[in-house]
A protein has these predicted regions:
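Alpha-helical scaffold segments that mediate packing/assembly in large oligomeric complexes
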Residues: 1-25
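Surface-exposed polar/charged interaction patches
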Residues: 29, 33, 71-74
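Structural motif
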Residues: 43-47, 93
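Sequence/fold signature of self-assembling virion shell proteins
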Residues: 52-145
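Hydrophobic alpha-helical segments and helix-packing faces
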Residues: 16-19, 34, 61
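Long, contiguous amphipathic alpha-helices that act as assembly "spine/axial" helices in icosahedral shell
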Residues: 1-7, 30-43, 114-128
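Short secondary-structure capping micro-motifs at structural edges
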Residues: 20-31, 64
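Intrinsic disorder/low-complexity detector
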Residues: 9-12, 40, 89
Length: 145
């Protein structure tokens, strides 16, 4: 857990430099725990438009998102609608950190109703993420709040 002190949507001046500095702090925390990337950043929906603001006045047309994506090892930034406001997850995208467990592959289910006059379909699957950690309880996920 890395505490940020100021939320990204509360920063008035120098917002771009502050956010990039905090992302670099997340990266260093991951490196200190021996997780070397590649990483994915997950943000709440209240940060989505903030990352589309200009990085600074000297580089108009360059957004904060574009500046973050220039940091080595960061593969992408995704919005998680259900992530609480002012929380950021920095996740190493490897099978030793997180993997997808498939309980049931993609299936089509078909049935008939109303005297075989109406055919209905549903598609279902069972998939859950499994968060993993090493024997020292390090998980490769850095939480910024």
């Amino acid at each position: 857990l890395v505490a940020i002190g100021t939320n990204w949507d509360d920063i008035a001046a120098n917002v771009g430099a502050t956010i990039v500095a905090q992302v670099l702090t997340l990266k260093q925390a991951a490196l200190d725990d021996y997780f070397y990337g590649p990483w994915q950043i997950y943000i709440p929906s209240n940060y989505e438009t903030i990352l589309d603001q200009d990085y600074d006045a000297t580089t108009p047309g360059t957004t904060i998102r574009e500046r973050i994506m220039k940091i080595a090892g960061i593969n992408g930034i995704k919005v998680i609608d259900h992530l609480p406001d002012d929380n950021v997850l920095f996740v190493q995208m490897s099978k030793d950190v997180v993997r997808l467990v498939r309980g049931l592959g993609l299936q089509n289910v078909q049935w008939k109703e109303e005297g075989n006059m109406v055919t209905k379909y549903k598609v279902l699957t069972i998939q859950v993420p499994q968060i993993r950690s090493d024997m020292n309880s390090r998980s490769g996920i850095v939480h910024l709040s």
